[in-house]
């Protein structure tokens, strides 16, 4: 039975009775509005479902990333332990093949090697360290595991308390670099005046032959801040913790052993605190930097190198001499600010978006002058083999991509396809709703005209 205004005419008892065909839907326009509302509700539900799934997806990825980081950290710790054991075994093998300390002194021309070795072995234990930088605790509680308190190794007790390492930077006077481990061994030596006394030594060659000095302060470096020599520290940082640490304390023959030992231990204490701060920074960087692709110009290794240089320049405000190229030490603060990761905009904390995670404070209050200490430029030098003890290398070359750490997991190809699909579905639903609404309006107009014509008839 067709819909419309079809009429049939019947006569009953002389009365005209009009019988209209029954209609299936009395109000088609209301039904079209209801269907349109349902479509919009379904579209909104679909949109919010996609948003919720995206948020859940992001949470799941973050959880998987944290689990993967924990596994990598455990693997790195195990690898570091294996490497430490291998290094210890190699050192033990080297110690077995190395000559004894008295024989080495005798070969280098040191007078009375037995007496020197006896004085080195019979030295009194290290005294209590002075307070650390910034009002920290003394060395008795904080440096209990340091190598200064270690007993001499059995079977090799005459060996010096420092180890041979690679020169950093390669500017040592003798071509050999050492890392100081014991203050007693440092203060028991007869030192030369380094590069400052080479001219005097050259002038004295015409006179009677002078005994060649055995050691040079410019050949001995700190353990962590391995670009600072003892010569630079004694000549520039002459009063650590209110101590008198001038060059005369070390270079003067028959000088005070206790004062010299306290000065070297104070320098080692500063170096130890700088290493602790660096390890804290490295752990925070590894915790919050989920991806190494945070910049197109820098990488985490660049950030660590300049941060270490800035940190050491804050603990040791001295001018460095054995450098290929020098820059003002305060410039490293700006280098850290530009090379370390930035805080990117996020859904929760947009107010901090675009700010640097490291901000230099008080740098522009005092303008840079010629009196500022100069530090070694490590920005373009090769990365040192061991930037910190116990810190594992997590990568080689720097990544050179434009994605940042927080946007990388959100702008993957799968999520882009999902967003495009949702937009296409919403566009299709809205187009169908508009087309159906226009059709319903046209049918409703036809029904209205038919009803009016029937009423008139």
UniProtKB/Swiss-Prot annotation:
Auxillary component of the NALCN sodium channel complex, a channel that regulates the resting membrane potential and controls neuronal excitability. It is found in: Cell membrane. This is NALCN channel auxiliary factor 1. Belongs to the NALF family. Residues 70-98, 122-160, 381-409 are annotated as: Disordered. Component of the NALCN channel complex. NALCN complex consists of NALCN and auxiliary subunits, UNC79, UNC80 and NACL1. These auxiliary subunits are essential for the NALCN channel function. One of its GO terms (cellular component) is plasma membrane. It comes from the Eukaryota. Glycans are attached at residue 216. Residues 133-142 have a biased composition (Gly residues). GO terms for biological process: calcium ion import across plasma membrane. Residues 73-83 have a biased composition (Low complexity). The keyword Ubl conjugation does not apply. Coiled coil: none annotated. Keywords: Cell membrane, Disulfide bond, Glycoprotein, Membrane, Transmembrane, Transmembrane helix. The chain crosses the membrane at residues 40-60, 418-438. Disulfide bonds join 187-260, 225-312, 245-260, 303-340, 323-376, 329-375, 333-360. PANTHER family: NALCN CHANNEL AUXILIARY FACTOR 1 (PTHR15819:SF9), TRANSMEMBRANE PROTEIN FAM155 (PTHR15819). It is a multi-pass membrane protein. Residues 86-98 have a biased composition (Basic and acidic residues). InterPro entries: NALCN_aux_factor_1/2 (IPR055288). Signal peptide: none annotated.
């Amino acid at each position: 039975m067709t819909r419309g205004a079809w009429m049939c005419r019947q006569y009953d008892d002389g009365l005209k009775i009009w019988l209209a065909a029954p209609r299936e839907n009395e109000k088609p326009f209301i039904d079209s509005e209801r269907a349109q509302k349902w479509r919009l509700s379904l579209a909104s539900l679909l949109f919010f479902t996609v948003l919720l799934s995206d948020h859940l997806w992001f949470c799941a990825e973050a959880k998987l990333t944290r689990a993967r980081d924990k596994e990598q950290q455990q693997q790195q710790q195990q690898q570091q332990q294996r490497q430490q054991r291998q290094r210890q075994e190699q050192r033990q093998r080297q110690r077995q093949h190395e000559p004894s300390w008295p024989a080495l002194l005798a070969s280098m021309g040191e007078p009375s090697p037995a007496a020197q070795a006896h004085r080195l072995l019979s030295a009194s234990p290290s005294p209590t360290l002075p307070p650390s930088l910034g009002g920290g605790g003394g060395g008795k509680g904080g440096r209990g595991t340091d190598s200064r308190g270690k007993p001499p190794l059995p079977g090799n007790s005459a060996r010096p308390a420092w180890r041979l390492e690679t020169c950093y930077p390669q500017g040592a006077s003798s071509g050999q670099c050492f890392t100081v481990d014991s203050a007693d061994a440092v203060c028991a030596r007869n030192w030369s005046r380094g590069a400052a006394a080479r001219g005097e030594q050259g002038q004295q060659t015409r006179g009677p032959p002078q005994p060649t000095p055995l050691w040079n302060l410019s050949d001995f470096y700190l353990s962590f801040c391995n670009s600072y020599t003892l010569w630079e520290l004694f000549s520039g940082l002459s009063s650590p913790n209110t101590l008198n640490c001038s060059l005369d304390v070390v270079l003067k023959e028959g000088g005070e052993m206790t004062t010299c030992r306290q000065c070297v231990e104070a320098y080692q204490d500063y170096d130890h605190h700088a290493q602790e701060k660096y390890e804290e920074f490295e752990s925070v960087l590894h915790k919050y930097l989920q991806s190494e692709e945070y910049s197109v110009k820098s990488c985490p290794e660049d950030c660590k190198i300049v941060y270490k240089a800035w940190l050491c320049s804050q603990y040791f405000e001295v001018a460095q001499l054995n450098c290929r190229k020098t820059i003002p030490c305060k410039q490293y603060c700006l280098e850290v600010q530009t090379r370390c990761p930035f805080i990117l905009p996020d859904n929760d904390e947009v107010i901090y978006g675009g700010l640097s995670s490291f901000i230099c404070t008080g740098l522009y209050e005092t303008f840079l002058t010629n009196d500022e200490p100069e530090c070694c430029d490590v920005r373009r030098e090769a990365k040192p083999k061991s930037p910190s003890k116990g810190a594992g290398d997590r990568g080689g070359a720097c990544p050179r991509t434009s994605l940042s750490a927080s946007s990388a997991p959100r702008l993957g190809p799968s999520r882009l396809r999902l967003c495009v699909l949702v937009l296409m579905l919403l566009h299709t639903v809205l187009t169908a709703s508009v087309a159906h609404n226009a059709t319903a309006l046209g049918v409703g107009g036809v029904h209205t005209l038919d009803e009016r014509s029937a009423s008139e008839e």
